[in-house]
Amino acid sequence: MLPSNQAGVAGSGRGLGLARRAGNGAGCPGIRGPGGQYSGSSGSSESGEEEDPPGRGIKRGLNELELPEQGGAAGVVGYPGASGTVSGAKPGKKTRGRVKIKMEFIDNKLRRYTTFSKRKTGIMKKAYELSTLTGTQVLLLVASETGHVYTFATRKLQPMITSETGKALIQTCLNSPDSPPRSDPSTDQRMSATGFEETDLTYQVSESDSSGETKDSLKPAFTVTNLPGTSNIQTVPTTSTSMQVSSGHSFPITNYLAPVTSANGTVLKTEGGAMSSGGLMQIPAGFTLMSAGGAVAQQVPVQAIQVHSAAQASPSSDSSSELVQTSSSGTVTLPAAIMTSSVPTTVSGHMMYPSPHAVMYAPTQGLTDGGLAVLNAFSSAPQMQVSHTQEQGGVQQVFLTAPPGTVQIPVSAVQLHQMTVIGQQSSGSNLTELQVVNLDTSNSNKND
């Protein structure tokens, strides 16, 4: 019995867990055949030693696990210090799950690389799941010993790894020499798995962020519709333009400036839907609506607002042709969708539509009492073109042009104010009220 037993263990030198099994359990008491075998470690163990060569990893019988002293004494004769229990398990415990490994540096280079590859993939997956399930911002950076850097970042934190400043800071930190361990308790505590995690960094969360980036309530603010019976717009790709405006607590746009050369009109100032003057602001050949925000100078477009795409279904849209531009950064979103419709559309209690020579805006309840605002007048408008362009700087522009040419309206004389949408279900969106300031100082009908 003893020679057979020694022959079964010889050549291993690593204790019971790595002993070689001779035959079908012959020579080792307590070991049964293929049926009803138990392993000391499961296949999902993360110790980096799953790929064992043939002959390693002995499988022991159930009766040996129940009696570790007898099985151990008979199975490891000549090897003092080796026990019959599984490494990392309590005596007498039937281990079928993962084996706990020591939290220390792995000296074996192959095992270390295998562990890094598996655990790096796992922590990247966990970061993605955390950001997706909870809608939080996550930044993860893993630098390997071979000099490769792996990152995962959500939208708001991507500049940390994509901007030149962020990349330079990361390179500086990684290229700095590894400082010896210091006696700083805060540093040791941050590097510990059980240390404090919260930092002194904070940031403000808006309502749109807290409800999810993809679930912002997008309510239409105004609608441009072709009136039945008017045939001035003939070659237009869209006869109904619907633009949606959604904002959080504050709207950064403060002013729109009209060019001084277009001072042909009189005051058009709306206060609560009522008109204080009935004149027109004449803009030759068309106008340009430019998305802008922040602190701006005259004649200079700004770049704080991005226009996102938002598809909207309308029951009256027979043939819908949409022009969509998408951008990914900014603090305020102006989703814009363009669709065709053959009838006027009323959205949120307000309507905007073109007449043969002007684009008019009024609340629906103000149509009968004269509460009509003429926003733009064309000297001659046989056709009108709606187009979107986006330059490399990320500034979205919406052009409404007539054939003679295009006149840009930079930021100056049209003020935007917030107004709650009547009958709106969501409390996070606001309707923007448009005010046109008089540019003709000699007009006697001017009201402040």
Curated annotation (Swiss-Prot):
<keyword id="KW-0804">Transcription</keyword>
<dbReference type="Pfam" id="PF00319">
    <property type="entry name" value="SRF-TF"/>
</dbReference>
<dbReference type="GO" id="GO:0010736">
    <property type="term" value="F:serum response element binding"/>
</dbReference>
<feature type="region of interest" description="Disordered">
    <location>
        <begin position="1"/>
        <end position="61"/>
    </location>
</feature>
<dbReference type="InterPro" id="IPR033897">
    <property type="entry name" value="SRF-like_MADS-box"/>
</dbReference>
<dbReference type="GO" id="GO:0030036">
    <property type="term" value="P:actin cytoskeleton organization"/>
</dbReference>
<feature type="compositionally biased region" description="Polar residues">
    <location>
        <begin position="201"/>
        <end position="211"/>
    </location>
</feature>
<keyword id="KW-0539">Nucleus</keyword>
<dbReference type="InterPro" id="IPR002100">
    <property type="entry name" value="TF_MADSbox"/>
</dbReference>
<dbReference type="InterPro" id="IPR036879">
    <property type="entry name" value="TF_MADSbox_sf"/>
</dbReference>
<keyword id="KW-0217">Developmental protein</keyword>
<dbReference type="GO" id="GO:0045944">
    <property type="term" value="P:positive regulation of transcription by RNA polymerase II"/>
</dbReference>
<dbReference type="GO" id="GO:0000981">
    <property type="term" value="F:DNA-binding transcription factor activity, RNA polymerase II-specific"/>
</dbReference>
<feature type="region of interest" description="Disordered">
    <location>
        <begin position="173"/>
        <end position="223"/>
    </location>
</feature>
<feature type="compositionally biased region" description="Gly residues">
    <location>
        <begin position="24"/>
        <end position="38"/>
    </location>
</feature>
<keyword id="KW-0238">DNA-binding</keyword>
<dbReference type="GO" id="GO:0005634">
    <property type="term" value="C:nucleus"/>
</dbReference>
<protein>
    <recommendedName>
        <fullName>Serum response factor</fullName>
    </recommendedName>
</protein>
<comment type="subunit">
    <text>Binds DNA as a multimer, probably a dimer.</text>
</comment>
<keyword id="KW-0010">Activator</keyword>
<feature type="domain" description="MADS-box">
    <location>
        <begin position="98"/>
        <end position="152"/>
    </location>
</feature>
<dbReference type="GO" id="GO:0003700">
    <property type="term" value="F:DNA-binding transcription factor activity"/>
</dbReference>
<dbReference type="GO" id="GO:0046983">
    <property type="term" value="F:protein dimerization activity"/>
</dbReference>
<keyword id="KW-0805">Transcription regulation</keyword>
<dbReference type="InterPro" id="IPR050142">
    <property type="entry name" value="MADS-box/MEF2_TF"/>
</dbReference>
<comment type="function">
    <text>SRF is a transcription factor that binds to the serum response element (SRE), a short sequence of dyad symmetry located 300 bp to the 5' of the site of transcription initiation of some genes (such as FOS). Together with MRTFA transcription coactivator, controls expression of genes regulating the cytoskeleton during development, morphogenesis and cell migration.</text>
</comment>
